[in-house]
Amino acid sequence: MLLRLALSVLPIVGSALAQAGGPYVDPDNGITFSGYTDPVHGVTYGFVFPSVASGSQEFIGEIVAPLANQWVGVSPGGAMLNNLLLVAWPNAGKIVRSARYTTSVFSSRSVAMTGPVLTDLPSSKVNSTHWKWVYRCQNCVTWTTSSGPQSIPTNDFGVPAWATSTVAVDTPSDPQSTFLEHTDFGFYGLDFSQAHVSDDQYAIWAAGGTTGSPSPSPTTSTPSSTSSTSSTPTVVATPYDYIVVGGGAGGLIAADRLSEAGKKVLLLERGGPSLGSTGGTYQATWLKGTNFTKFDVPGLFETMFSDGNPFWWCKDVNVFAGCILGGGTAINGGLFWFPTYNDFSSGAGWPASWNNHGPYTAKLKARLPGSDHPSTDGKRYLEQTYDVASKLLNSQGYTNITINDNPDFKDHAYGYSTFDFANGKRAATISTYFQSAVARPNLTYKQYTMVLNVVRNGSQILGVKTNDTSLGPNGVIPLTPKGRVVLSAGSFGTPRILFRSGIGPSDMISLVQNDATAGPNLPPQADWINLPVGYNVSDNPSINLVFTHPSVDAYENWAQVWTNPRPADAAQYIKDQSGVLAQASPKLNFWRAYSSSDKRTRYLQGTVRPGAASVTTVYPYNASQIMTITAYLSTGITSRGRIGIDAALTARPLVNPWFVDPVDKAVLIQGLNDIVSGIQNVPGLTLITPDNTTTITDYVNNYDPGSLNSNHWVGPCSIGIVVDENTLVKGTKNLHIIDASIVPSLPVGNPSGTIMSAAEQAVAKVLALAGGP
């Protein structure tokens, strides 16, 4: 059914389209678009193409936005990096626009894309409430950037990306104006195969003509099996003792230990395989002939953020989150620290019964010892930044240690970066716990299966509802009579499942209630469970300092390792998984404790690596000699945020957790000043971001708030607040959480090791509960 679009009825269109695109007619020009209206910001995105048979390289598009959206961008190819990005904004009653692409997720800078030809069509306009850009985009279906050829899937289903900002661009009259990073972004599904009309009709619209609704042109696409409403035989669902939702660090440990105990376990992962050993196939060209994927090779970590086909990121979470086997541990830098005593102390928010983490960390260490020299030849490579940084730190009284041999020594301590890699490849919980779990006949693993909500009768969980109707009637998978569900979907995924299950604050559950698809699956309002899900959220505020030193090899800033690595290094890695590519970019880590005005002790962690995400300086510099020190504030911070969902049910931060308490900011500024205070003790070391035209304080005060994100989110389902000491969700009889969301405060280092140790302890407590299964 076609939807009639008018500026005054945008909320109606948004409600109708939800998160999947559909056809509508623009009444100003009669063009039939396939599009989507974001219900949060009220922005509509539309596309229409000539016939598939024409093989045309153009389309007509439109953006309709309320004036509150100072600029809007859309990427029909479905990614922000190395993809066509069309950006527009109103200025003096007219539309200013450009075709661009971005090269780094760490910078809001974009560059003009040569090739696309944009023509504004007559129905573009600005009025008192909205602005509308209707355009013809020629040479816009395929393009080539440094990551290779890209294209819009014009005869298939696609996932366009959008971005918007409430902050105006720097120079509104300039189509190539710079601007700050978007204040929000997202994705939606669109069947491009249905977005075509006849060539004659398209030609009329492209010339600025108007007409009524046309007949869509024939396409060669086949119907999607997921949209069929035909009658099918009733599926008989298999009940399980435990259903583990999510194949990240916590979920894989839980599934392994539960199945090891002889329980009948179902492990569900919404994404697909990662490592080659798990069925993953996404390879760089130079890896062809091996079984190594992008996720196996540690040296490809930096390319996770610059790939034109980043299918591993969750499309319904507006921060980086891994929707792939292994979750965040499949795509992060692999830094791996055994927890300190304080990480599980009562002062850090843990129940007293959790204080002795030692036996559980020992179990973790037996399975995953980690290494600060993961290359199979035992050597370390590209260590110039280690040498430079160690001189800087030695001058400030730091001690060089083997970090995981001294986990409680975290003040004025530094050492080689330690990773959860093994045999020169990424390991984490994927090649350890997962491999032993799936080898057991009592564990069933299903990938590409998304859990929407738990099915419950009051406090009793009966099973889970998924998107896979082959697993049970309407996708519902039941528990055995004494069974339990373990949510391990991460700090954004787990809260959303709870909201969709009627568990959490009423404002979040009400958003679910108003959703046409999710609302009917809620329990009766009398059975809603009011818990502070989403509150008490922490993440490390982090700031990058960029230096140059003549001894440093920036390794082409990691820009060539995917498409054109140094030949000798590629050959060495393929031969025996040794060399530069057998470890990720970090080379050194350090910690320092700070007392502060509120009498609390806060810890600063530093990570040193060759290369830099972005450089801001008025002076010339040698890009082949750049290195970065990232300073994070961790244990002891008091700032907290909130995680929730919006009207589209996209998971997102509702309140950012960085610098809510000004004391946190003051301590981080002090730490940065201390780091740079020793520069004169290292001949040749130059700070270029910030350079000498900016003070550290001004640099921090003007730092892009979105760039403070370290993506180390913990706490939205904190133990003692949302779950009890046995990880049981309060108000339920058999729903548990084992993931980062129960961690009540930030550990002193990157959280993966602490999360894994917590998972070992949590699953032991679950198995010890009376009442089974």
Where is each model-derived feature located?
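FAD-dependent oxidoreductase catalytic-site/capping-region signature
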Residues: G349-N404, S578-T754, A762-P773
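Extracellular-facing/secreted segment signature in eukaryotic proteins
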Residues: Q19-P218, T222
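Fungal secretory targeting signals
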Residues: M1-V25, V486, D739, P773
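Residue-level detector of alpha-helix initiation sites
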Residues: G248-A249, R380, Q384, F492
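Conserved redox-cofactor binding core of oxidoreductases
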Residues: Y341-N453, I461
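N-terminal glycine-rich phosphate/pyrophosphate-binding loop and immediately adjacent elements
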Residues: P233-S346, P351, S510-V512, L522, ...
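Classical protein tyrosine phosphatase
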Residues: N69-L86, L252-N291, N342, W350-N356, ...
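Glycine-rich loop(s) and the adjacent beta-strand/alpha-helix scaffold that form part
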Residues: R257-E260, K264, G271-S277, T281, ...
